[in-house]
């Protein structure tokens, strides 16, 4: 079941948090920056992965924290190539492909709940009315609660329905 909530995704009790990024992203804004600051080991491992594997847009990369929670980075944006270059914009086909991979990952790892923000609708400029149907299509049949943090409220813990 998919639920739209207001609150701070960092207070979510979900077993996995997903976010949209670019391959080689520097995590300088929004949720990515907050995760980079709270989990520097995740960011270090992400950078190493990108430098050694050269991931493509439309894929995912996951990381498990010490408390057993997954952070799943969805490559929704065009990559940042070259030192100091900025990531490109998000594209709907990248969002769709990465959500499909996320669905497969959730089933494979038996993840019991997922939280994600309004993917690719912040700095990257996609229209939520085009992104939300992709989430419904790719994640709607999962038999777990999926929490979309549609309205960010810093420091506010949302009430997450169990299903």
Language-model segments: what does each one mean?
Residues 1-163:
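Macrodomain-like recognition of ADP-ribose-binding/processing modules
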């Amino acid at each position: 079941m998919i639920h739209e909530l207001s609150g701070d995704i960092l207070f979510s009790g979900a077993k996995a948090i997903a976010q949209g990024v670019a391959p080689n992203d520097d995590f300088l804004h929004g949720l990515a920056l907050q995760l980079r600051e709270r989990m520097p080991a995740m960011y270090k491992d992400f950078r190493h992965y990108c430098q050694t594997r050269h991931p493509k847009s439309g894929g995912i990369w996951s990381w498990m924290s010490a408390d057993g929670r997954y952070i799943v980075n969805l490559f929704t944006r065009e990559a940042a190539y070259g030192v100091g270059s900025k990531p490109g914009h998000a594209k709907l086909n990248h969002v769709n492909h990465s959500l499909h991979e996320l669905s497969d990952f959730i089933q494979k790892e038996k993840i019991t709940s997922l939280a994600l923000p309004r993917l690719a609708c912040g700095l990257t400029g996609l229209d939520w009315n085009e992104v939300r149907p992709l989430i419904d299509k790719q994640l709607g049949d999962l038999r777990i609660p999926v929490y979309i943090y549609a309205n960010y409220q810093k420091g506010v813990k949302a009430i997450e329905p169990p299903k």
